Amino acid sequence: NNFDDSWGIWGHNLRKVLGKDAEKVYATIHGKTDDSQLCFSSEDMYRQIESYIVDNFGEKGNFRFVIAPDDTPYACTCATCAALGNTEKNATPAVTELILRLSQRFPKHTFFTTSSLTTQQVIDKQLPPNVGVIVSAIDYPLRRTDGKDEQDKKFAEQLDNWKKVTNNIYIWDYINNFDDYLTPFPILKIAQQRLQLFKQHGASGIFFNGSGYSYSSFDEMRTFVLSALLINPELPVDELIKSYFNQEYPVSKKWLYDYYTELENNAQSGKRLGLYAGIRESEKGFLYPEKFIKFYDEMGDFVSEAKGKERKKLHELQTSLSFTRMELARDHSFDAYGYAKRNGKDIQPLPQARKWVTQLKEHQAFAGMEYYNESAYEIDYYIKEWEQYILA
């Protein structure tokens, strides 16, 4: 589902509800009106949200609404917010009072606060059944989890504290490298361990934040596995991966399975996966160049041998991983994994480097492969830079 459609208010979208009237409810920060944050004790704020719900969803439906401050580190400290208990970096008191008021006004709807930045502090009162919390896992490192690490204990304690005041605990977690959608990101075994911990400590729902509508390598397989783990986090990950590849890739199933599960096992080293990682960090964590390059170079044979849907999917994967091959080559420059050799003062690009570029140009044939990261950096521009500055 599109969260903007299936939730009455989703994420940090409260300003969409307020529209031009947002200026009436700007926060007071350091004694001055500040348009970077909102005031949650404002009567105008309550009335505008109330009208929005009545006009668009009615009073008898069962919709969900997130009431969250903007993603900034400061809270409103106007006289009313301060009287409720707000401090410079804690908006929990005022946000809680607004949510409680809305939950009483609309008992059929459900309202969520967040546990992130200015609302990290847990509420100090029992919440009604139609109120919950969405806990951000942004600060919980993506790495092997055994429940004994200090970061594991810290996040588990946060969930336990929320469990004391509500049974409606959702987690907002992350499953992609947002600087590079195209390089493989072996998150499945780590995600399984996190799901087990979340469930053990009272979570009742999980949101996985991935690449959205943009293509991400192995994404269909990962979606298949994660969907199964959301139902039962005890299922064996390797068997789920094998099941998907057996079903969708009759020719290349073993080759894909062997390489992808190797990536997953590499990621179990205990090193942190970077949510915003360059190729060098990925290489240090799980993407061993020699193994990846062998896999990439073998791909052409499997594309040629496969037929129909499998061939199209392999061609799509080959195209996306050409970006990874080019990033490795760019980073390694003139060594065994690079794009060129030095000949005295001259630099001689390898013949295969132009083949990588040609292969990546085929991204236009595939839906969702226009950008390679969260910032919407265009693959076409990346190719242009290679042609103008690296291979020129």
Language model region names:
Residues 1-65, 69-107, 132-135, 160-186:
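Feature activates predominantly on carbohydrate-active enzymes
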Residues 111, 115-139, 182-187, 215-223, ...:
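Substrate-binding cleft/loops of secretory-pathway carbohydrate-active enzymes
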Residues 37-47, 54-55, 153-254, 258:
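Structured mid-domain segments that build the active-site/substrate or prosthetic-cofactor binding neighborhood
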Residues 74-79, 142-143, 218:
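Short acidic/His/Gly/Ser-rich catalytic and metal-binding motifs that mark active-site loops
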Residues 86-102, 129-148, 198, 227-235:
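Acidic, His- and aromatic-enriched active-site or binding-groove loops in soluble protein domains
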Residues 119-127, 131, 139-165:
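Noncatalytic carbohydrate-binding groove/subsite architecture in carbohydrate-active enzymes
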Residues 59-60, 125-128, 200:
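Extracellular/periplasmic catalytic domains that process cell-envelope and extracellular macromolecules
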Residues 229-392:
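Catalytic domains of carbohydrate-active enzymes that cleave complex glycans
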